[in-house]
Amino acid sequence: MTSNITELNKWIEGYVNPQSEESVKTNAINMVLLYMKSNKIDLQDVVQGLGDYLKSNDSILRARGTLLLSEVLCRLPDLPLNQDQVHFLAMFYCDRLQDYACSSEVVKGITGLITNHTPDYPDNQKLLRNIFSEVHPTSLTQAHRKMVLQVIDIMFNKCLSEIQELKNDFMVGYLQFIDNEKDPRNLIFSFKLLPKVIYNIPEHKHFLESLFEIISCYFPISFNPKGNDPNSITKDDLSNSLLNCFSCTPLLAEHSIPFLIDKICSNLIETKIEALQTLVYCCDRYGGFAVQPFLEEIWSTLRTLILTHKNTTVIEESKKTIFYLTRSFTKERKVLESFLSIMIKECLHHIKSSQDSKIAIYCASILYQSVSASLLSSKIILIHIFPNLFNFLSELQKQDTVQKVNEQNSVIALFNDLLKANSIAFEMYSNENKEPNPLEPFVDQLFKLFSDLLLLNSSSSIRSNSIECLSNLYISKKVHTTEQDDDDSEQITNEFLLDLEKRQFIIKSLVSLLNSSDNTLRHKSLDSLFTIASNEDPSVLNLYVIPTLLQMINHSSCNINTTNNKINNNNNNNNIVIKNNKCQDEHCNEDHSNKNENNNNSNENSNGNSTSGSDDDLKHYLEAFTKLCTHQPLLESVIPQIQVLLQHNIKETYQSNEDFEKSILILQSISFILEKSTNIKSMTICSKSILFPLIKGLYKQELISSSNDNNNNNNNNSNRFNQILTPTLKMIHSIFENISIESQKPLLEKLIKLFLNGDTLVINYQLPTTTTTIIKPFEKSSPYKYLIPIFTTIISQSKLDLSENNELKQSLYQMSLDVNVDDSIAISCSKAYSSIINKQQQQQQQDQINFNFFNDNLLKVINDTTTPLPLKIRHLDLFTWCTKALLTNGNSINIKLGSCLADIISNENVELSYHASKSFGILLSETDVLNEKSGSIIKILFEQKFFTLMFPILLESFKVSKNKELQTISSHYLIAISNLLKHVPKEILLAELNEILPIVMQSLKSSDNNDQVQLLDSSLQTLTMLINETPSSFISYLDSLIPSLIKISTKSTKYNLKRSALEILTLLSKSIPFVNLFPYKTQVVTDIIPCLDDKKRIVRREAQKCRNSWYILQK
């Protein structure tokens, strides 16, 4: 024991002695702590050892001695101390606080004592009193000032009642310690502590003014943290903590609100914005009654900002402030009514007296924000505003309508804004209080007003605004309360404010405007119908809108056919085409007798314009039908009508070219509708009701075009079939892509029978007696090969594994290599074949698909010098798509196949080499097949993996061909590389920057002939991205880059290349330092002058921007 004491004294001497080295001090304190931890010495031993030092006349020795004791208390949280020892230490520190030289060390000791132990009453009070009375905050370092705050915080948690007994003394001492604090670490702690003080010390109300003076000096927070410290305190941290201080008690409202209003009037935009946001937060926390005395002052300030300020950000923030304040005041109705009464009175005054002015528009926006804030605010405002607006509009209508159109429009626009705002409020808050819609008392008056304006007013702008008002009134709902039968509880159901009759009137009025000569009215009507369709039950629209549109579409079609027949027959006997009052179109039952009587005399004069007019009508109706049917619930209900449209427009014969063009327009519209739908339910219905009739119609078309003996007619029919095929393939693609694998399976089984076995009964089609052969499109001599894309589209979108169907695979394989079919057919077969390969099971794929398969069947033919070029191209296309299939599903041979594709680029045949280089664009690009929607297997990051392994191979081949001076081959390798660069993420490009930049720079020197356009375009795109990401990397290339870009912008024959080059020059002027660009300034400004006279406006505009940017270059 004696030896331990001896060692202890030695360590105390080493620690306390100011002459000791830091290593000695560190070792000494560590050994003291170690011995105490192992119970070889105790606290009493340490105190006795420190006795002489604590009594020393040397302030440094006293401080070091005190620090040693404090370190022990802080660093040994589990140190066993009884209450006598705790009391002794508390009294020791109370006494030692009078020693100014030891204040920091004592504060640390008190922190350790309070944190790890609990002194008895009233030791905590004595410690805190002595800290407040003896310690001056300015004498402490940041860390020790924070310790004082931590001591207060701990005492609040451990002995709150003792702290509360201090009353005013605590508040005086606490304010002393937080005043004039500047360190952000202490500030954030004091800000977080303040609400706790407010909540727990009732005497704070006597010190509110002093308290607010202390915290308000920090607003707004201006603090920039160190950028290299991720754990540093941020400006937002300080701002949020200060915000909680401002709002911690309603008693601060009398100080904070005038202060914030003063800050809102600041000249600094940032200060205004932050003050507005703080005002909203504080008012919400204070409650309406605390804010009520300041309502007029708040409104006056916000009104001034909105009506007079020039900065849009400030104006929008002020509007948001009104919205949130109104929502907050909803909790106290009297306060809300007081606030809104001030606002309504002034807004109405400006609206009536300042019509067609910016002030009136801003007042309308203020009302919009207030109405949308809550259901109660909407009710209060609408009750006061609507009667005034009705009277005011009536007065305007009695005056000269021509001069007052703008004023009327402003009032109608305000009606519309209020309807929208009320809908927002009702949708957000109606279910909370089960209150009726505030519009309910005015609904009949509003309906009559807007209906009369639409039907009776001659102003297009007023009618347009009234259309939007009617649609917003239409979708406004009410809350209908009914009782449930089981437990008598109330059930809330939403119903429209307008009854069905009024809603049907609006629908009919809007439909009647769909063919208006006024584009604004037509588009506004269509948009309003779509808005209604998004809210209304589809059955209501199916009562009138859809049947009417379909009737109009068919009627427009009939007009086209009728007009053409009249033109054709007019020179013969001037017979009228309508017989028995029925249209000659076999699919139309329209009665045209009235039209015939009225228009018979005018046909001779109007024949030249009627066709184009009917064509425009048809486009307008189709536009409406298409937009409405993109709404999913409505689409499901109109699928039968779409089926009828398809049957009527994929006909065996067309009466004229105009009739055919009309059918194409309808098919394109249906195609657009189905493309926009991704709903499985809707597409499943389409697959059952539309798919097979659609294919049947296409079969009939192809049968007609293939069986016609007349060459001219045959070519015409073939062209028509191809035009029909384009939109119908998109329909088939959309349907099959969006149905489940369970729905696909039975359909595929039937379609394989149809296309491979010629079983047309699958589509319920009996071949004509004149057809002696079975329709098998995949037979070598079949004249029906144009049907193949239908089948390949389906196979490509199939989610099933079809790899076991060898007949299917062989048919696709052979057709993809057939040089006697169109390229589009062969490519579609290659896509379908690759899709099957992609979806094979991995083990089966390894067994059936290996490198030898491709080498023996495709590569040998491609590399054989005796093979005709068209056949090589076919094999190369199939090889490319198969490579893409195996690349996307992560097959291990994909890199080997890619290397073979790269080798083909070095082929002596220039056309084959160029085709191979373009193939690299297919490998990584997004296509309509081999994607996730089609059920393909897509491995994660396959693009990055392929680029990482393939780029070095292509780069090395490019260097070899360049060294051998094979200019054409090297340019083809550049095309392949550029195609890779175009489709990989920028992170990958940046990682290979040193290798990529020389390649891109080399590519810019290519000519813009047909073979090189793709290379230049891709290189310019890559260049733009790289300059945006790492502009400094191009400084060393400026001497070659800038002349190359100038040459492209002035000499290229492709306007898109010119524009891209000019955009890059502009980008360089903004991204590269002035000192590097200045030597080229004159060259750029002078040499791009020819672009200012370019025949393309887009080039001229970009040249002007580029020249201006370079002309004003400055340091």
UniProtKB/Swiss-Prot annotation:
Classification lineage: Eukaryota, Amoebozoa, Evosea, Eumycetozoa, Dictyostelia
Organism: Dictyostelium discoideum
Keywords: Cytoplasm, DNA damage, DNA repair, Nucleus, Repeat, Transcription
Family matches, as SUPFAM superfamilies: ARM repeat
Protein purpose: Key component of the cytosolic iron-sulfur protein assembly (CIA) complex, a multiprotein complex that mediates the incorporation of iron-sulfur cluster into apoproteins specifically involved in DNA metabolism and genomic integrity. In the CIA complex, MMS19 acts as an adapter between early-acting CIA components and a subset of cellular target iron-sulfur proteins.
Main location: nucleus
Ranges of the HEAT repeats in the UniProt entry: 944-986, 990-1032, 1035-1075, 1078-1115
Gene3D superfamilies, sorted: Leucine-rich Repeat Variant
InterPro entries named in the record: ARM-like (IPR011989), ARM-type_fold (IPR016024), MMS19 (IPR039920), MMS19_C (IPR024687), MMS19_N (IPR029240)
GO cellular component: cytoplasm; cytosol; cytosolic [4Fe-4S] assembly targeting complex; nucleus
Region (Disordered): 587-615
UniProt protein name: MMS19 nucleotide excision repair protein homolog
Entry's family note: Belongs to the MET18/MMS19 family.
Coiled-coil ranges from the UniProt annotation: none
Localization terms from the record: Nucleus; Cytoplasm
Subunit structure as annotated in this protein's UniProt entry: Component of the CIA complex.
Biased composition (Low complexity): 596-613
